[in-house]
Structure formats: C-alpha cells, structure tokens
Amino acid sequence: MLQFYFLSVAANFLAGATLSGDWMSERFTSLARLLAALSGRRARTVTGLAAILVGLGTLFVPAAPPLVLGDLFPSIVGMAVGIALLFEVFKEEAVFPGDQPARGERIAKTPRAYRTALGALGFAAAVLHFFLPERLFL
C-alpha cells in the first residue's frame, strides 16, 4: 500500500535524522534548527514509536503481491532505529532521576557510537527506499 510506503520513508527519515542529529548539525548548519526540535524527549518518543509501529506494519502489509520481502530492509532498520530511540529516552528518564546530577552528567558524557551509525543507516534506508520503491530488498 502506498500509505505504508510513505510512512516507512518518513519514519525512517525522521528517526535517522533524530539519532544522527549531533553529527548532522555539525556538518549541515542549515538543519540545526530542525534537528534541535527533534531532539526533545517528546519528539524522540513519538518518532521512536512511529518507527517501530510502521516497521511492524510494513512487515505484514507488502507493497505489491509478488514482493514478499519488498519492505524487509526498511522495516528492520525502522524497528532498530525506533528501539534505539526509545531505549535512549527511557534510559535517561527511568534509570537516572533528577536527584543524582553527578551520575547523570557522567552518563550523558559517555560516547554513544551507535547513534550516528544507526541514524545514518535509517536515513540511508529512507532515501534508498524512496528512490528505489519496487526493488526486492528496498
């Protein structure tokens, strides 16, 4: 269905941009304002949930009848990016409440190497899925 195709592209694009926002805002200064809006807790939660739900939906609703695996790659990437976003949000809020600022600052400074790579993968999956809609694994 065309709706799931569009939702898959949009969810992967936004989730990938959200995860790799630090890297993208350094490279592309014109996107800094948009990426700052996506870095809020509510935006990350909604984007993560949307990526997971759309990823699950595109697994069960194929794009065309002969393509069984047509949306496999974007679906898996969308679910992975969504899980990473939700894990990041819930890790910040649930594990480290506001009464422990020193420990929270130390954890916030630790490098999250997976964020940029997984975000770039989600971004690339969205772009490839947009330009190559009827390929077997895209």
Language model features with spans:
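Cytoplasmic membrane-interface regions of multi-pass membrane proteins
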Residues: 23-34, 89-104
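Hydrophobic cores of alpha-helical transmembrane segments in multi-pass inner/ER membrane proteins
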Residues: 9-18, 49-51, 77-87, 122
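Juxtamembrane helix-loop boundaries in multi-pass membrane proteins
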Residues: 34-51, 71-74, 104-122
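Intrinsic N-terminal pre-sequences and regulatory tails
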Residues: 1-8, 137-138
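N-terminal signal-anchor/start-transfer transmembrane helix
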Residues: 5-30
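Juxtamembrane boundary at the C-terminal end of a transmembrane helix
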Residues: 125-138
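Short alpha-helical packing/oligomerization segments
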Residues: 63-94
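Long, highly hydrophobic alpha-helical transmembrane signal-anchor segments
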Residues: 45-67
